[in-house]
Curated annotation (Swiss-Prot):
Gene: Cndp1
Organism from which the protein derives: Rattus norvegicus (Rat)
Signal peptide positions on this chain: none
Major location category of this protein: secreted
Tissue specificity of this protein: Detected exclusively in kidney.
Highest taxon in the source lineage: Eukaryota
EC supergroup of this enzyme: hydrolase
Cofactor(s) in the UniProt record: Zn(2+)
Name used for this protein in its record: Beta-Ala-His dipeptidase
């Protein structure tokens, strides 16, 4: 294990964070109390979002940061109403050319939550039970944002020189698709981002409950709809059953042609683009700390498709997967309605892995469904549409900031982190990497059972406080490595 850097400084920083942890938890409580729901297009909730962004801006100003709240205008909703879009916060603290500049991305909006959804506590009242801090946004993403701020404020409180220049980009519309964020990043490429060396995102989770992780890749996502239509009106099955091609039967056949019972995608050529899995990756998966029995139990699944850790992780991270999500237009209420839908719309998505591109996948899927539909000789009309196409993201794990993060994790947690990938899609990582051409890293703080987006979302007090220490140690390590000091042989 590597010896901790600046041990005297670290000891003071860690001691301060421990002594002030109740204060840090109280601030998180104040932030969680704001119902900053960006998903439901309601004027009251937009006001809450603006209040949340203003509170964060004030917090950063109190740190001494120069803060710019970028006005994004308004958002036209499908029903015709116009709602104001909360500003994106761009903040800067320090501009010493001798120091590395690191930009932290976070979001302050949350998914909808109501106690009647199955919460054991009020989702907007941070409640501590057995060291777990329950509340909407506690782990996604208000807790990690505050952990970063806690680290910066600790240096300031102790009058310690902050070893890095810090920038913040905080948004309030991530859960609603990051409205206008990509355009802002493009616009600020040669301004706000010009002096940035590294970008850090802390918006995902560890793979376990206790062992920290670094995320080095995410899958992409292509979301499709397939419509089968006979007419706009539904049919009575007693009057029309047996004398026409039923749209639902066509759609079920189409959806059933996409994937088999073992999870293998049946679209011809879909695996051809996939990057080969290297021996280095296989070794990495072997070294990851994952208790399959615990993982299965916490998932409340009777059995997974794969029996080994390596197979499960490979199929979760490095193989594409296809999921069927739902059908519009079908009768799905209690009772026995004998209707034949006149039009149905199926929804499914494919998670992409390195070297796969949305445009090629779109062509392959469309050609496959057209071929299947043609063989049915149906008189109905079929239309396939790709409504979302997001590429996978891969990081350079041998870059400076991954080395710094690994060393910081070793210092704070006393273990080497799991190097994990994320089977989901986090578009902002790819957006930052492609537009700014800067080094992007995902450094999660939350445990696997934090329940982001779910009922009873939480962050452990331990994760929140140790995460604040982690970011403080990361600043020191990044400064040390960026200045050109040698990394010991075998450090990564």
């Amino acid at each position: 294990m590597l010896s901790p850097p600046h041990s005297g400084t670290l000891e003071k920083l860690f001691q301060y964070i421990d002594l002030h942890q109740d204060e840090f938890v109280q601030t998180l409580k104040e932030w969680v109390a704001i119902e900053s729901d960006s998903v439901q297009p309601m004027p009251r909730l937009r006001q809450e979002l603006f209040r949340m962004m203003a509170l964060a801006a004030d917090k950063l100003r109190n740190l001494g940061a120069r803060v710019d709240s970028v006005d994004l205008g308004s958002q036209q909703m499908p029903d015709g109403q116009s709602l104001p879009t909360p500003p994106i916060i761009l903040a800067e603290l320090g501009n010493d050319p001798k120091k590395p500049s690191v930009c932290f991305y976070g979001h302050l909006d949350v998914q909808p939550a109501q106690k009647e959804d199955g919460w054991l506590t009020d989702p907007y009242t941070l409640t501590e039970v057995d060291g777990k801090l329950y509340g909407r946004g506690a782990t996604d993403n208000k807790g990690p944002v505050l952990a970063w701020i806690n680290a910066v404020s600790t240096f300031r409180a102790l009058q310690q020189d902050l070893p890095v220049n810090v920038k913040f980009i905080l948004e309030g519309m991530e859960e609603a698709g990051s409205v206008a964020l990509e355009e802002l990043v493009k616009r600020e490429k040669d301004n706000f981002f010009s002096g940035v060396d590294y970008i850090v995102i802390s918006d995902n989770l560890w793979l376990s409950q206790k062992k920290p992780a670094l995320t080095c890749g995410t899958r992409g996502n292509c979301y499709f709809t397939v419509e089968v239509k006979c007419r706009d009106q539904d049919f009575h099955s007693g009057t029309f059953g047996g004398i026409l091609n039923e749209p639902m039967a066509d759609l079920v056949a189409l959806l059933g042609s996409l994937v088999d019972s073992s999870g293998h995608i049946l679209v011809p050529g879909i695996y051809d683009q996939m990057a080969p899995i290297t021996e280095e990756e296989k070794t990495m998966y072997e070294n990851i700390d994952l208790d399959l029995e615990e993982y299965q139990k916490s998932s409340r699944v009777e059995r997974f498709l794969f029996d080994t850790k390596e197979e499960l992780l490979t199929h979760l991270w490095r193989y594409p997967s296809l999921s069927i999500h739902g059908i519009e237009g079908a009768f799905d209420e209690p009772g026995t309605k004998t209707v034949i839908p006149g039009r149905v719309l199926g929804k499914f998505s494919i998670r992409l892995v390195p070297h796969m591109t949305p445009s090629v996948v779109e062509t392959q899927v469309t050609q496959h469904l057209e071929a299947v539909f043609s063989k049915r000789n149906s008189f109905n009309k079929m239309a396939v549409s790709m409504v979302l196409g997001l590429q996978p993201w891969t990081a350079n794990i041998n870059g400076t900031q991954y080395l710094a993060a690994r060393r910081a994790i070793q210092t704070v947690f006393g273990v080497d982190p799991d190097m994990i990938q994320d089977g989901s899609t986090i578009p902002i990582a790819k957006i930052f990497q492609d537009i700014t051409q800067k080094s992007v890293m995902m450094l999660p703080l939350g445990a696997v059972d934090d329940g982001e987006h779910s009922q009873n979302e939480k962050i452990n007090r331990w994760n929140y406080i140790q995460g604040s220490k982690l970011f403080a140690a990361f600043f020191l390590e990044l400064s040390k490595l960026h200045s050109g000091q040698q990394v010991p042989s075998g450090a990564f």
